[in-house]
Amino acid sequence: MPNKITKEALTFDDVSLIPRKSSVLPSEVSLKTQLTKNISLNIPFLSSAMDTVTESQMAIAIAKEGGIGIIHKNMSIEAQRKEIEKVKTYKFQKTINTNGDTNEQKPEIFTAKQHLEKSDAYKNAEHKEDFPNACKDLNNKLRVGAAVSIDIDTIERVEELVKAHVDILVIDSAHGHSTRIIELIKKIKTKYPNLDLIAGNIVTKEAALDLISVGADCLKVGIGPGSICTTRIVAGVGVPQITAICDVYEACNNTNICIIADGGIRFSGDVVKAIAAGADSVMIGNLFAGTKESPSEEIIYNGKKFKSYVGMGSISAMKRGSKSRYFQLENNEPKKLVPEGIEGMVPYSGKLKDILTQLKGGLMSGMGYLGAATISDLKINSKFVKISHSSLKESHPHDVFSIT
């Protein structure tokens, strides 16, 4: 009888990175990375295409910091197009001179508060100079992406998103190594050969090679690692994230195809590990869902503020439009839907900028330990050790009463 257990597979908590001799200071590293061969990011972060994570407000906020947001598809074609247009037409408020005057139209913050001192107006105005790392296209517009899947109106949706000048599309599926996904990529690439496509989600080298062969520009890795995803327990399918990234990287190594690690990021150290395993960037849902900029509902529970966080495989999300992501488009009876996600809530965490500051800081620190001046260095030169449960326990604060 053949051995069906092919190998051991590991995730973030199963490994730790080995520090290397380094002349690199965290403050000296570059976080710039490639999303595709045509699109670069100034920070390796994407906001997830989830209806409680990314609409135009989130996409604008993350693009201003150097990343990119992916507008979810649980809305009409026209609504999704308008969300893209809000990002692409976003304008920074005009800079006010230090004396409070300007030859340009005054920003709303100034005209709405007539009694502010001029110096206060200057402090409150938003300046282009405040966002030197903003992710912009060749026309100096903020970049943004959008998700599509296998729906009856997918090609029509793509056409409208292209008209809105979307920068990149995500072919969004729970199982990217599907003949339907492969055929959809072929159709889109035939009609729009210069449109960059992210395809996923996948976890194997074979899937990567098949998607690359039909024109995928970037691959999204992750089946089941997300905090609100239940695919691994409902369907029994998935590969732990570190191993999945490593396997896909094996197919993409020495090519210009980039990798996004999607799901399972809880700490900044997980970002470092994901990139060290072979990812060029990470996609985040949970950590961004609690921010001010997410479109999710605010909830007060036991006197504390939370925001809703809903898996795209949950019943409610499927009803709103994500059935096709899980190949249940033909199922029109809610009672017959098989969910692969849950609904929950996460603590309100304030501005996205503050969350990104912590994630970037942890990544920069890790790069310093590993002697990696660039994201590429981190991918190529890093090595892991497998750790025990006791090692994991040792890695977290222990034997103290925490006061912060």
Swiss-Prot record:
Residues that, per the record, bind NAD(+): D172, G222, I223, G224
| Record's catalysed reaction(s) | IMP + NAD(+) + H2O = XMP + NADH + H(+)
A single Gene Ontology MF term assigned here is: metal ion binding
Q: What is its pathway?
A: Purine metabolism; XMP biosynthesis via de novo pathway; XMP from IMP: step 1/1
SMART domains from the UniProt entry: IMPDH
Look up keyword Transmembrane helix and say if it applies: no
- Give the first-level EC class, as a single word: oxidoreductase
Record text on activity regulation = Mycophenolic acid (MPA) is a non-competitive inhibitor that prevents formation of the closed enzyme conformation by binding to the same site as the amobile flap. In contrast, mizoribine monophosphate (MZP) is a competitive inhibitor that induces the closed conformation. MPA is a potent inhibitor of mammalian IMPDHs but a poor inhibitor of the bacterial enzymes. MZP is a more potent inhibitor of bacterial IMPDH.
Which PROSITE patterns does the protein's record reference? IMP_DH_GMP_RED
Under Enzyme Commission nomenclature, its number is: 1.1.1.205
Q: What function does this protein fulfil?
A: Catalyzes the conversion of inosine 5'-phosphate (IMP) to xanthosine 5'-phosphate (XMP), the first committed and rate-limiting step in the de novo synthesis of guanine nucleotides, and therefore plays an important role in the regulation of cell growth. Essential for mouse infection by tick bite and critical for the survival in environments that appear to lack sufficient amounts of guanine, guanosine, and/or deoxyguanosine to support spirochete growth, such as mammalian host tissues.
Task: Supply the NCBIfam families for this chain.
Answer: PRK06843.1
Q: Which family does it belong to?
A: Belongs to the IMPDH/GMPR family.
PANTHER family the UniProt entry points to: INOSINE-5'-MONOPHOSPHATE DEHYDROGENASE (PTHR11911:SF111), INOSINE-5-MONOPHOSPHATE DEHYDROGENASE RELATED (PTHR11911)
According to the record's subunit comment, the protein's assembly and interactions are: Homotetramer.
Tell me what this protein is called: Inosine-5'-monophosphate dehydrogenase
User: Which gene specifies this protein's sequence?
Assistant: guaB
